[in-house]
Structures are given as structure tokens and as C-alpha cells.
Curated annotation (Swiss-Prot):
It is found in: Secreted. GO terms for cellular component: extracellular region. Residues 37-138, 144-256 form the Gnk2-homologous domain. It comes from Arabidopsis thaliana. CDD domains: Gnk2-like. The gene is CRRSP25. Residues 1-31 form the signal peptide. Belongs to the cysteine-rich repeat secretory protein family. InterPro entries: CRR_secretory_protein, GNK2, GNK2_sf. Disulfide bonds: none annotated. Gene3D superfamilies: Gnk2 domain, C-X8-C-X2-C motif. This is Putative cysteine-rich repeat secretory protein 25. Keywords: Repeat, Secreted, Signal.
Length: 259
């Protein structure tokens, strides 16, 4: 027997496993929010695997309920399958429309079921959303364990030092803007900010975002932590990002978000 409920606060998941990987951005991602490219997924072995046929149906029930509450760009839900608790959260990118958010949830859940069948803990990232499913309830905590980075294959052609410095400054400025926004009802851009900076004849475009279960203080901590990885992951690259289940950033030399 399964049960489920919804609540506005999101759930961060404390987990055992850690996967770090580097990927190249695909050409299909280069358009302005026109695709929903798959980015990465993690099957969390530390939480175990559920035997039996009813578990996936119980998880689907939670996801189906969540799909009706996407006007804010995020939602979390909870339920159970016998003794196994089910917690799920969805965070859509703030510039994604409600229809794109709903479509991303459907795609993410369909794919994570194939990639990590019956896993209690599993996370999947797409260009437009993050879906995090777990058997462990931890509210408003930062997940430091499941972080990965991506970068554009192309290097900056000139003045790499100035490019790195200006990109870093832009990202930190966006972090401050994101955490200073007031949490108004149904505000999609809470804990999110996007902007651009001129670099001679070019511009760098960037965004930062935290999941909305975090406080502004924890959002700042999370973003500062992943921004500290910028030199190692993306130094001299025309584009790059670092993503976790709690926060992420991205920058490019082309516009990729709606402003």
C-alpha cells in the first residue's frame, strides 16, 4: 500500500555515494532554451535497491501529484511503499516556462526509471530541470557529495587571464543578486539570477541558481562552494558549469537563458 502528500518546502538528500565527472557540452545545447539536453544522472547505491514490483508505482504516484504544482518552478513530494519512504524534489530553471517544466519532469522521471530502476536514491539533471528522488528526508541541507562539472570544448582565443577574472566577478555578482531577492509567493526567480558582461567585442552570459528549499544563507554557502571549483573545471574555457543537487552555475559566450 502506498501513500503520498505534497508540501512546499523542498527536501535535500544526504547520501553516501559520490560521482564527479567532466563532460563536453553538446552542440544541441547552444540554442536559447530551445532544447532540454540530458546532462547527467547518479544512481545512489548507498541507499539500496527496493525489491518488488510496487515500488516504482508508488514513486510514480508521488511524481504525478507533483506535476500539478509546477507554477512556482519547483515542488517536492513524499509518500511511502510499505516501510520504504519516498521523497522527491523538482527544481526547474527559473526561465523555463511551466509547460517546459512539466515536460522536463515527465522526461526526467521516465529516464531515471530506466537508468536506475528500483533505486531508493537517484538524481538526474537536464538543461531545464533537476529531479532528486530519495528514501532519506533531510530538509534544507546542502548536498556536497554529488557535484559534477561540464565545460565547452573551445578555449578562449585571447587574454585568458582577463576572461577568467571577469567571468568570476560576474558569477559572484549574480550570486549576491540571487540571495538578496525577497521570497514572494510564487516567485520563480527566487534564489536565481542571470546577467551578462561585456568583454571587448564579446559578451559573457551567466546564471546561478539554488533549489528553493535552501535559505538565502545556505544558498550563498552552496554557490560559494561550487564557484570555488571554477578555476579547476573551466579555466580558459569559453563556457562551463558546475552542478549539484542544491545549486548550480553556468556561463557561456552566447545567450542561453531568457532574461
Amino acid at each position: 500500500m502506498s501513500s503520498s502528500f505534497l508540501s512546499r518546502p523542498l527536501v535535500s538528500v544526504y547520501v553516501f555515494a559520490m560521482v564527479t565527472m567532466q563532460l563536453l557540452f553538446m552542440q544541441s545545447v547552444l540554442s536559447l532554451n530551445q532544447t532540454n539536453a540530458y546532462l547527467n544522472h547518479i544512481c545512489i547505491k548507498g541507499e539500496g535497491i527496493v525489491k518488488g514490483s510496487s515500488y516504482e508505482g508508488s514513486v510514480k504516484s508521488v511524481i504525478d501529484h507533483m506535476s500539478t504544482y509546477l507554477d512556482y518552478g519547483f515542488v517536492n513530494g513524499a509518500g511511502s511503499d510499505g516501510p520504504t519512504n519516498i521523497y522527491a524534489k523538482l527544481q526547474c530553471r527559473a526561465d523555463a516556462s511551466e509547460s517546459k517544466c512539466r515536460s522536463c519532469l515527465a522526461t526526467a522521471f521516465s529516464e531515471i526509471r530506466k537508468k536506475c530502476p528500483n533505486y531508493k536514491g537517484r538524481i538526474i539533471w537536464y538543461d531545464n530541470c533537476l529531479l532528486d528522488i530519495s528514501s532519506i528526508y533531510t530538509l534544507a541541507e546542502i548536498d556536497y557529495r554529488h557535484i559534477f562539472n561540464m565545460y565547452n570544448a573551445k578555449d578562449v582565443s585571447s587574454d585568458t587571464m582577463a576572461f577568467n577574472k571577469n567571468t568570476r566577478a560576474l558569477l559572484y555578482a549574480l550570486k549576491e543578486k540571487a540571495i538578496s531577492k525577497k521570497e514572494l509567493p510564487y516567485r520563480r526567480d527566487y534564489l536565481y539570477s542571470a546577467g551578462e558582461e561585456s568583454l571587448g567585442k564579446k559578451k559573457v552570459y551567466a546564471m546561478v541558481q539554488c533549489t528553493k528549499d535552501l535559505s538565502a544563507k545556505n544558498c550563498s554557502v552552496c554557490l560559494s562552494y561550487i564557484l570555488s571549483k571554477l578555476p579547476k573545471c573551466c579555466k580558459g574555457k569559453q563556457g562551463g558549469s558546475v552542478l549539484s543537487p542544491s545549486c548550480n552555475f553556468r556561463y557561456e559566450l552566447y545567450p542561453f537563458v531568457k532574461t
